[in-house]
Amino acid sequence: MVTTGAVVGASSGCSRVATADTGDGGHLLEQLRAKGTVRLGIAGEQPYGYIGADGEITGSAPAIATRIFRRLGVDRVEPFPTEFGSLIFGLNSLQFDVVAAGMYINPERCEQVLFADPEYQMKDAFIVPRGNPKKLRTYADIARAGARMATGIGYAEIDYAKDAGVKRIDTLPDQLAGLLAVEQGRVDVFVGTAVTVRNVVEQTKSTKVEATDEVTPYLDGKPVVDVGGFAFRLPERNLWAAFNRELHKMKRSGELLDVMRPFGFTKDQMTDIKAEEKCRP
């Protein structure tokens, strides 16, 4: 494994573009086996994929990927940290091989990448000042209060907030930046996935903010069940299919929950939803 600095340095000036789909399912799996290494695109977001205090890649998605790729004959994983909003571009410009960031699956993204079936389902939660003085428990509450909201760059929560009528939306690099913005009074609320919000509040031991209970987002008046999964380049169907087979074996055996539990996931976040269901417009 390599450190953050080594990977970022290696990415400078990358101008490669993805090759066209030849219709044969791609050859990336064979290439990865020959190299013995797979590069994972991560967004530095706990608990999905990030660099730990020891300089090594960690998180639920890299932990899953490490097991699956070893079974596919690829023994090493390397991190490629980038901003969340750059993950799909980075994947399709060949900067790394797989997005391992717990990325939500939606129709817009499905036009650009090939998703494995999701490894988890998730609701949202808010970071608010201690005591939640504005009583923000839903997106509609944020809109009614005229509150200043922040979320991550490229997050699905932006659309949920707009759908609820939220007018003041800032974007920040990650959930830690969001927590600090709430602490310092620059925003009234930071919105993220429930497990992400809970983890960052617990780990920072902040006395100035708190995490709300889980929040169900809505689009067009309908509740949304978000699911997250690994993303592959569209031509690489052979790698995608092999990865998906191993992922389903982990689901059936209960191994998937065992791998994800140390990162704050529970049985409630396990899902049988298929990627194709979330890719439909």
Please provide the spans of the model-predicted regions:
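Extracytoplasmic small-molecule ligand-binding "clamshell" domains
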Residues: 2-4, 8, 21-102, 111
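Ligand-binding clefts/hinges and TM-proximal coupling segments of bilobed small-molecule sensing domains
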Residues: 16-22, 156-169, 241-281
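Flexible hinge/capping segments at coil-to-helix
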Residues: 31, 129-147
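Hydrophobic/proline-rich hinge and linker segments of small-molecule sensing/allosteric domains
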Residues: 39-45, 115-137, 230-233
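Extended ligand-binding regions for polar small-molecule ligands
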Residues: 62-71, 132-133, 140, 223-267
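Short helices/loops that flank or line small-molecule/ion binding pockets
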Residues: 67-71, 78-81, 85-99, 112-114, ...
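A ligand-binding cleft/hinge motif common to bilobed small-molecule-binding domains
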Residues: 103-111, 159-160, 188-224
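Periplasmic-binding protein-like
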Residues: 121-125, 205-244, 267-281
